[in-house]
């Protein structure tokens, strides 16, 4: 199948960031925004070598003159031409490899439409001439990265969150739930509540500033009401942040109000249950015999679970819902921002996995639908 000396490529395509690197590494080599930008205006300078599109960090840095598009919305690829550009950029510019020489492991959102997996497979074999490929479910990889094969994963990135119960390595599809509430919504909500304080953030460029404020200063309160009272009566929770132009702004209760949306989606007008309740409901959807294994293996994954205090709060909230004698353990690995990628790196370097790859030959014989038979 694949020679031992050729490292497999692992590419985790998130709604917000692409994480890419080589199987066997402990962290991705390349992490860049999943964006494709096209010039808004006609170029006027002769010989400037105008490009018709920019990808990732370059698009981000030139965002003033570009229209930015995210080809992955809510975890699912919606624009295949742009997606191809992102993969091209990943292989040739970021990793600097020839894709026809390396097997590639891609990740997909749970409940990804069948046609999407087929399209991914087709592009890898027909556009990039991959020798072999595989598509793995993101949440399952996060669980592998934590050294488990059974557990319930709450995976929350920039565009989508999923709660996925997994038993002995298999995701239980009837109990999976997707929640379109994730990092981007928290950033938007933080923009809104900062406006109430008198700071105006409106453009896409300013949204990046607010995202940075969120990542640096926000946290999850153990007791929201209590924290609101503390914030009202003293300035102990206030922190200052310097904007790129040197202006300094102060933020107080916004630090935990933004992240509280995960537990109370009604803050942004969503009629959904909070993440603690969702996890509990999904466990209850599973067979009664495996529930206690899920309670003690509740794994957090993805960038939007990086808020300080989130694990303690989950522990407290789920304990309140679960039977009183039930042992509950929330696992929040420090590297959870990249745990999907790390799980992919582990999986693709296992000797037992090598027969799982879909080879070019198998693809030529069966066509794109082979992905449903070999990847589950």
From Swiss-Prot:
<feature type="propeptide" description="Removed in mature form">
    <location>
        <begin position="1"/>
        <end position="2"/>
    </location>
</feature>
<keyword id="KW-0206">Cytoskeleton</keyword>
<dbReference type="GO" id="GO:0005737">
    <property type="term" value="C:cytoplasm"/>
</dbReference>
<keyword id="KW-0547">Nucleotide-binding</keyword>
<dbReference type="InterPro" id="IPR004001">
    <property type="entry name" value="Actin_CS"/>
</dbReference>
<keyword id="KW-0067">ATP-binding</keyword>
<keyword id="KW-0378">Hydrolase</keyword>
<comment type="similarity">
    <text>Belongs to the actin family.</text>
</comment>
<dbReference type="InterPro" id="IPR020902">
    <property type="entry name" value="Actin/actin-like_CS"/>
</dbReference>
<dbReference type="GO" id="GO:0005856">
    <property type="term" value="C:cytoskeleton"/>
</dbReference>
<dbReference type="InterPro" id="IPR004000">
    <property type="entry name" value="Actin"/>
</dbReference>
<feature type="modified residue" description="N-acetylaspartate">
    <location>
        <position position="3"/>
    </location>
</feature>
<dbReference type="GO" id="GO:0016787">
    <property type="term" value="F:hydrolase activity"/>
</dbReference>
<keyword id="KW-0963">Cytoplasm</keyword>
<dbReference type="Pfam" id="PF00022">
    <property type="entry name" value="Actin"/>
</dbReference>
<comment type="function">
    <text>Actins are highly conserved proteins that are involved in various types of cell motility and are ubiquitously expressed in all eukaryotic cells.</text>
</comment>
<dbReference type="GO" id="GO:0005524">
    <property type="term" value="F:ATP binding"/>
</dbReference>
<protein>
    <recommendedName>
        <fullName>Actin, cytoskeletal 3A</fullName>
        <ecNumber>3.6.4.-</ecNumber>
    </recommendedName>
</protein>
<keyword id="KW-0007">Acetylation</keyword>
<dbReference type="InterPro" id="IPR043129">
    <property type="entry name" value="ATPase_NBD"/>
</dbReference>
């Amino acid at each position: 199948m694949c020679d031992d000396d050729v490292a497999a490529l692992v590419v985790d395509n998130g709604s917000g960031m692409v994480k890419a690197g080589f199987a066997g590494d402990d962290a991705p080599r390349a992490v860049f925004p999943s964006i494709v930008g096209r010039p808004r205006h006609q170029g006027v300078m002769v010989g400037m070598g105008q490009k018709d599109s920019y990808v990732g960090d370059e698009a981000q840095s030139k965002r003033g003159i570009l229209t930015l598009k995210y080809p992955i919305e809510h975890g699912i690829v919606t624009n295949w031409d742009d997606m191809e550009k992102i993969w091209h950029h990943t292989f040739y510019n970021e990793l600097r490899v020839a894709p026809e020489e390396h097997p590639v492991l891609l990740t997909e959102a749970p409940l990804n439409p069948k046609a999407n997996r087929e399209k991914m497979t087709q592009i890898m074999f027909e556009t990039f001439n991959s020798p072999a490929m595989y598509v793995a479910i993101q949440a399952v990889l996060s669980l592998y990265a934590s050294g488990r094969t059974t557990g319930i994963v709450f995976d929350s990135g920039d565009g989508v969150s999923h709660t996925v119960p997994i038993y002995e390595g298999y995701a239980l599809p009837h109990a999976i739930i997707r929640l379109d509430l994730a990092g981007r919504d928290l950033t938007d909500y933080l923009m809104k509540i900062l406006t109430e304080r008198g700071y105006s953030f409106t453009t896409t460029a300013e949204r990046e500033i607010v995202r940075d404020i969120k990542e640096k200063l926000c946290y999850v309160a153990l007791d929201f009401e209590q924290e609101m009272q503390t914030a009202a009566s003293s300035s102990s929770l206030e922190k200052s942040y310097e904007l790129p132009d040197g202006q300094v702004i102060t933020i107080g209760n916004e630090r935990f109000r933004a992240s509280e949306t995960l537990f109370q989606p009604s803050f942004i007008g969503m009629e959904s249950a909070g993440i603690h309740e969702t996890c509990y409901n999904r466990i209850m959807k599973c067979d009664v015999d495996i529930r206690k294994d899920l309670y003690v293996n509740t794994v957090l994954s993805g960038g939007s679970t990086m808020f300080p205090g989130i694990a303690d709060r989950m522990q407290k909230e789920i304990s309140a819902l679960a039977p009183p004698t039930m042992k509950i353990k929330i696992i929040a690995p420090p590297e959870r921002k990249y745990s999907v990628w790390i799980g992919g790196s582990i999986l693709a370097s296992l000797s037992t996995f090598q027969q799982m790859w879909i080879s070019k030959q198998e693809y030529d014989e069966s066509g794109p639908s082979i992905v449903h038979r070999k990847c589950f």
